Structures are given as structure tokens and as C-alpha cells.
Amino acid sequence: VEFRNFDKALDAFKTALEFQKGDFNVRFNIAEIKFVSQKYQESLVDLESLLKDASGNSNYTGMIPLVKFKSLLCKLKLKDVDGAKEYIGDSDFLSDSPIYYYGNAALEYNSGNSAEAEKWLARARRVFGNPQTLGPWQDTLIEFGYIKSFYGGDLELESGPPTGE
């Protein structure tokens, strides 16, 4: 996936899934490929299935917030703002993950409020501090087109949502 050959990566993960039936991580990677390929409806179906299967399973507790965040973004792309809000409805500033901050930032970006979105991201950086913790969340916003990559590539986002400029 890192080399942006999504078709090849998707084929590889589908093959892996044949050998590792129902494997959560393989299924997550398939949903992720659909997400970065802007197949948001397909990704959402896969992500919601992961959430259902992960519910109550302590092995996946750490992944649930990121899966919810990606689901929230899919809902925004599909113009279901109320549905998107549901994914952060049970979170607050005491949450163990950045979902509260990044979810609210995404909602602000979606509403065209870039300055407010940046405030939410700054709060997340202050609260969580560790770039490794925030990396997947930041990468997700980059893939979605709300923020620019540190490595350039801005011009590739022409078909993505507005970046607030």
C-alpha cells in the first residue's frame, strides 16, 4: 500500500484472507485500501463489519477508535453528517484515543471551518504528544484530503474534498 499500487495490494490481501479466514488485520487492510482508493461506500461496509466483530473483543480494543474515525470520514464523504457524528458520540476529552479530537476536527473541516479544525488537532497534539500515537490519525486526514502531506503531492488531491483554502 505504501507504494500506492492499490490493485496489487488488494489482490494480495484478498489472497491472504483466503488463508486466514476472517482475520481482523487483513480485513482492516482491505477496508483501508478501499478508503485510500476513494471507494468510501465499500470501505464503510467493511469498516462497520469490523466494528461489529470487534465489539466486546479485547484483542481489538486499540483498533476500534481508528476504525470508527475512518467510518466517520466515509459518512462525511457520503454526505451523512449525522451518521458521522454518531461515531464520536460516546467519546469525550477523557478518551484513551485521539478520536474525540480528530473526529471533531473532521467535522469542522467538513463544515469549512479550517481554523476550528486546526484547534482540535492542536489539542490532540497537546493531549497525546507522541507522534507515533497520532501518526495513523494524521495520515488518515492526509489521505482524505483535509490536510496536506509533509511530502508534497498537493496537486493529487484535486478530486478530494476541500482542504480549507
Residues covered by each model-derived region:
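Register position in tetratricopeptide repeats
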Residues: 2, 19, 36-37, 77, ...
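Residue-level recognition of tetratricopeptide repeat
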Residues: 32, 73, 104-107
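Terminal, low-structured helical/coil segments at or just beyond the last alpha-helical repeat
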Residues: 114-165
